[in-house]
Regions:
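Substrate-binding pocket helix/loop in short-chain dehydrogenase/reductase
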Residues: 4, 32-35, 39-44, 144
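Catalytic Tyr-X3-Lys loop
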Residues: 19, 36-55, 77, 101, ...
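Short C-terminal tail/terminal secondary-structure segment
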Residues: 32, 164, 175-190
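Active-site helix of classical SDR
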Residues: 58, 97, 105
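Alpha-helical segment proximal to the catalytic Tyr-Lys
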Residues: 63, 110-111, 172
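Short, small/polar-rich loop/turn modules that mediate ligand/substrate recognition or access, typified
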Residues: 73, 113, 118, 174-176
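Residue(s) in the substrate-gating loop at a strand-loop-helix junction
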Residues: 81
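A conserved structural motif in NAD(P)-dependent oxidoreductases
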Residues: 148-159
Length: 190
């Protein structure tokens, strides 16, 4: 957390004022398994990156946004996970971290809306990245069997297509919106 302010200062000295932050910090549970066996060090590791890192990075960027007049639209975009709202007891630390990051996004949205800064949350589902490599084999058949109504893994470009209108202000009145990017995975089914 101590490195956040110097990092943002360095970025702004090189690139100019930040108008959009996409907070995409995320690490999986170090050890998947029974939540009753989670060790404090593993819990802290996941929450330090997935929650504390995202929160304090957004806080510093928001402070800097508020410290200068705006000529461009400004936005904070939190990339959390469908796990913010879909519990998995074998990855409880991850789910807890993403649920807390979701609440942080909502709090920032309420705080920054009067200042004209949009805050959004994206909840990716099963996205084909390095982070999903270890779960790919066990989810292929489940996806083919209907777990994801769209019938496929999400791609990083699916996230990008949602981020762009948020960053450009095309969704400014939707501040605080939670947008699932999961091919229908999180749709409740009966």
């Amino acid at each position: 957390v101590a490195k956040v302010a110097p990092l943002i200062a360095e970025i702004e000295s090189t690139c100019g004022p930040i108008t959009t932050l996409v907070s995409n910090a995320g690490v999986p549970s170090k050890i998947a398994g029974d939540m009753l066996a989670i060790e404090p060090a593993n819990f802290d590791f996941v929450l330090d990156i997935n929650l504390r890192g995202s929160f304090f990075l957004a806080q510093e960027v928001a402070r800097r946004m508020l410290a200068r007049p705006a000529s461009d639209y400004r936005a904070l975009i939190f990339v959390t996970s469908v796990s913010a709202g879909m519990v998995s007891v074998d990855r409880a630390d991850y789910c807890i971290s993403k649920a807390a990051a979701s609440m942080a996004a909502e709090a920032f949205a309420v705080r920054l809306a009067p200042e004209g800064i949009g805050v959004f949350e994206l909840r990716p589902g099963l996205i084909e990245t390095e982070m999903s490599d270890e779960i790919r084999a066990r989810h292929e058949a489940r996806i083919a069997g209907g777990l994801v109504p769209a019938g496929r893994w999400g791609q990083p470009a699916d996230i990008g297509r949602v981020v762009v209108p948020m960053a450009l202000g095309a969704m400014d009145f939707a501040t605080g919106a939670i947008v699932p990017v999961d091919g229908g995975l999180s749709i409740p089914r009966r």
